Regions:
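Conserved C-terminal beta-signal and adjacent last beta-strands/turns
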Residues: 2, 6-7, 12, 28, ...
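Outer-membrane beta-barrel translocator/receptor signature
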Residues: 91, 108-110, 122, 131-140, ...
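Surface-exposed extracellular loop regions of Gram-negative outer-membrane beta-barrel proteins
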Residues: 92, 104, 253-264, 383-387, ...
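Periplasmic-side early beta-strands and strand-to-turn transitions of outer-membrane beta-barrels
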Residues: 164-166, 174-179, 185-286, 319-346, ...
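Structural signature of Gram-negative outer-membrane beta-barrels, strongest in the C-terminal barrel
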Residues: 234-238, 365-368, 380-382, 402-525
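Membrane-embedded beta-barrel scaffold of Gram-negative outer-membrane proteins
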Residues: 298-327, 460, 466-472, 495-583, ...
Length: 731
């Protein structure tokens, strides 16, 4: 017995071909089937009535050659966007425009990240380095039945390579610009007749390369030192029991996000003369250091008892560290002898220390060898604690403690009505409880329980095409935001948000299995949607509920194996998001240097100070790109005992509003980046080896990724152009 169970009805069709590996495909002159675990069992994508994109192979590994982190996946999957204002530690995920732009380490997210079947709830845990990955699956839309709360937008699933009986190994070394040196290696195989193991390591290093012109220091910031290791042991004590134990560890030291003061001119969203990628002007922040470590352990046990299989997944995660940064992005202030670049109302530097613990337990049962009905049911328990100590510099540090406990019961079934029609239905009940403990008796306790589910109908039009329709619901648990306590304010609370969505999809394979198309259209409404009001006039971090919101969009994935030498992919996503709350207002930029385009009014804050409010009814969601485009081309030509190859990838991000309110400055338009790698690989003999040259951000685009609006027109940018070479071996 092997787990997870593979569906007997799997059709040799793969969808989301945009993101499949190319090298192995050319040799067969057809596109290989893609297997996913989107429904907690192995299935062909053709059997799954969900909009799913997958990524693996060269398409995946090429993104990380310049020392990139998980944000490199952003816009490379249609409908997926990732950004961070906290360096490599706290990525924020968005799917179909839905996410959370709150930078606070306690903020909940509507996109769930799952690594090797273990949910990573906190943003620090979501940042574990991505290496030795078999595939990535992006599940778009609510996944409330099988995965529960906080999946209203979707899920990003990472599946590591697992141990096999065959002895295998691989190693890859990248050397590039700015002193970039990356190494990734893995080895595994059979240890005894019923025990297998695999261990993988990663190191990513980059030198300081950014000058601090205020202090006169050259190469003062930008360093990366990241080390990670993970391993698995697979054990089969009997013929009907499988055990898989995993452990991982990560150690990070380096530079956090760099905020650049007044690089946006009032009335314009183009970078101005204050911006120089290789220069900052910091008088605080001590070089914006960031240090974190993370360890985790998980145990999966599968027991085949004949007609049924019982599965248990137990996991523990722990992480701690700190980030310190110059938030105003410049030096001095208007009331000090000097300031710059541009207008600095007041200095701001903050350090956050975090200690994260998480425990999860899942028990489920499913039937085996079902002729017409496959079902699974289970229970899930989640318990997490987070302590955040914030030092704003002008008052004593404050520690705020968060705890979150959740229970769930779930079930889902696939009923094969005929050879062509399949009905899928799922339901889940969830209880979610959150507590906050803060100084001066500012304690808060909130809880909620919800029922979510899905119903879909799939029709196989032929052996190579299908259509489906799906309705689904989900919810994000209530939220507590306690960051303002550290700045003399009070905590805020938001009720649970609930989503209802409908989507229709089409999947097809044609041209003798050399082309694949995956398309979906959808519409969703979110009641009591949670938004984070970050910064602005008054410099607060508050969670709020809007009455309602909605979005409509589409996704398209296409892959075409032109011939044995050329493989092309294309991805496209469009989403139109809208906030629907006629009375909802938020504070605009604190510096008054930005240009709001929303209706505004002058009011008073909690301290009686004048503040400019904007009505955000009808606005798009923050950090929700209206369009994303991606394109790749792979070329291979056999020579001698191997082949020469070239691979290029490009992505474009359309109009994106950074904050809840709209301005002329804090929005991005038609940003794009591309990469290229070319070389020679030998694929005959006892082992394969490869040598290549690569370039990331080949045109050296200077793109805004986000902003800080409470002080001045501050922004942070993308990664620089990185060029280099790599050598790898695999056996």
């Amino acid at each position: 017995m092997k787990f997870p169970i593979r569906a007997k009805t799997a059709i040799a069709l793969a969808i989301s071909g945009t993101l499949a590996t190319g090298a192995s495909l050319a040799s067969a002159q057809v596109l290989e089937e893609v297997i996913v675990t989107a429904q907690k069992r192995e299935q062909s994508l053709m059997d799954v009535p969900i909009s799913i994109a997958t990524m693996s192979g060269e398409r995946f590994t090429s993104l990380f050659e310049g020392g990139a982190d998980v944000r490199a996946l952003s816009t490379r999957v249609p409908g997926l966007y990732i950004e961070s204002s906290n360096g490599r530690v706290a990525p924020r995920f968005y799917i179909r425009g839905l996410g959370n732009s709150d930078f606070d380490l306690a903020a909940s997210q509507p996109v769930s990240v799952i690594m090797d079947e273990v949910v990573k709830e906190n943003v620090v845990l979501k940042s574990f380095p991505i290496f030795d990955i078999d595939r990535v699956e992006v599940l778009r839309g609510p996944q409330g039945s099988l995965f529960g709360r906080n999946t209203t937008a979707g899920i990003v699933k990472f599946e590591s390579f697992k141990p096999t009986e065959e002895f295998t190994g691989r190693a890859k070394l990248d050397v590039g610009d700015y002193g970039t040196v990356n190494f990734e290696g893995a080895v595994g195989g059979g240890i005894t007749d019923n025990l297998q193991g695999r261990v993988a390591v990663l190191t990513q290093n980059r030198d300081d390369w950014i000058d601090n012109d205020y202090t006169g220091e050259s190469d003062a910031l930008g360093e990366i030192e990241e080390k990670a290791i993970k391993g698995f042991l697979a054990w089969q004590p009997t013929d009907n029991i499988d055990v898989l134990f995993g452990a991982h560890y990560r150690d990070l030291e380096g530079t956090s996000s760099l905020f650049r003061a007044n690089v946006l001119t009032t009335g314009d969203n183009d970078l101005n003369e204050n911006y120089d990628r290789e220069t900052v002007y910091f008088d605080e922040g001590d070089g914006n250091p960031q240090e974190y470590d993370n360890d985790g352990y998980n145990l999966k046990v599968g027991w085949d008892i004949g007609a049924y299989t019982l599965t248990s997944i137990t996991a523990y995660e722990n992480a701690n560290g700190y980030s310190f940064g110059d938030i105003d992005g410049g030096f001095g202030a208007v009331f000090l002898p000097e300031m710059g670049p541009g207008f600095i109302p007041f200095p701001s530097a903050t350090q956050d220390d975090a200690d994260v613990e998480q425990f999860t337990q899942e028990l489920r049962i499913n039937n085996n060898d079902a002729e017409r009905l496959f079902w699974q049911a289970g229970v899930f328990y989640f318990d997490a604690d987070l302590d955040v100590k914030t030092d704003p510099g002008f008052t004593d540090p404050t520690t705020v403690s968060h705890s979150n406990e959740s229970w769930a019961v779930f079930g889902q079934g696939d009923y094969y009505l005929t050879d062509q029609w399949t009905l899928t239905a799922g339901i889940r009940w969830t209880y979610d409880d959150k507590e906050l403990d803060a100084p001066a008796g500012q304690s808060t306790d909130i809880d909620d329980d919800q029922v979510s589910g899905n119903l879909s109908l799939a029709y196989n039009m032929s052996d190579n095409s299908m259509v489906w329709g799906k309705i689904a619901s989900g919810f994000r648990g209530p939220s507590i935001q306690g960051r303002d306590v550290a700045f003399g304010g009070v905590s805020s609370v938001a009720d649970s948000e609930t989503i209802n969505s409908i989507e229709f999809g089409y999947k097809a394979e044609f041209l003798d299995n050399r082309a694949r198309l995956n398309a979906a259209v959808y519409y969703y409404e979110v009641d009591d949607i949670q938004f984070s009001v970050v910064g602005g006039d008054g410099n607060s971090v508050t969670v709020i509920n809007a009455d309602s919101s909605n979005a409509a969009g589409m996704e398209l994935d296409l892959q075409f194996l032109v011939n044995e030498y050329v493989d092309l992919t294309f991805g496209y996503a469009y989403v139109d998001t809208e906030i629907d709350d006629s009375n909802l207002e938020v504070a605009t930029c604190g510096s008054r240097l930005c240009t709001p385009t929303d209706p505004t009014r002058l009011g008073l804050d909690q301290f009686g100070q004048p503040i400019l409010f904007a009505n955000i009814d009808g606005n798009p969601f923050p950090q929700a790109p209206e369009t994303t485009l991606s394109f790749t081309a792979s070329f291979r030509y056999p020579v001698s005992r191997g082949e020469i190859f070239a691979f290029t990838d490009w992505a474009m991000q359309g109009d994106t509003n950074i904050f809840l309110y709209e301005t002329k400055e804090y929005k991005t338009e038609d940003q794009f980046e591309g990469g290229l790698r070319a070389g020679y690989r030998q694929t005959s003999g006892d082992y394969d080896w490869e040598v290549a040259a690569f370039v990331r951000n080949i045109t050296d685009e200077e793109n805004i990724q986000g902003g800080v609006d409470f002080n001045n027109n501050t922004a942070f940018d993308n990664e620089p152009r990185i060029w280099g070479g790599s050598v790898s071996v695999e056996f």
